[in-house]
Amino acid sequence: NVYIEYDCGANRCGLESFKEIQSLIDLINTMSNIKFKGFQAYNGSIQHIEDFVQRKINVQETCNKIRSLKTRFKDYSPIITGVGTGCFDLEVKENVYDEIQVGSYAFMDAHYSSLKKDSKVNNTINFKNALFVLSNVMSTSVKKQAVVDAGLKSMSLDSGLPTVFNYDLKYINCSDEHGVIEDLDNLLKINDKVFLIPGHCDPTCNLHDWYVVKKDNIVIDLWPVSARGFSY
């Protein structure tokens, strides 16, 4: 079974022209070893839109395109797969998807956790953070700040700086191997452990070899990051 990627708004990969899609389906149908099954219709570009109203507008635009696609190719009874963590609550209500392929919800990250769930209240999508980068305080030589050993080489910053877990403190700056935490009350001491919630979970995982798995504050396993260093 093969799926055709439909460019539903990300302008990244896939086909948008129905004529080109039909030609590809026809080509697939000439082959005995593969079968056309449906469409990959994932719009990753809308998943991190912070404003709820704008995110909803973009979801509706995306799903309207997919709805037209389903109508045009209804004779093939295509399966439509898509949806992402940032917009899943809006996308599933549009009733155009047959399969939900969300993934980041399992880990979450600082940026996903900051998304407003609706336009009335300032709350977030209801998944807890499960991915943390463990850092150590290595310097407190400057008053009202602490320096930890986790910077650009430990976390991806394309979606913003990490947040500090279990402390009312703010990670404010970083370099290759150092991170600066604003610590107005000088709470942190040398060698203190600080858990950081990365701004973007996916590319952060790619920087590490192992997940250290904890349950009830006890390490129970080590999981290798099997895609470590892969760019595909």
What are these regions (language model features)?
Residues 11, 137, 219:
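Glycine-rich, flexible loop/turn motifs
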Residues 49, 85, 124, 130, ...:
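A general structural signal for short secondary-structure boundary/capping elements
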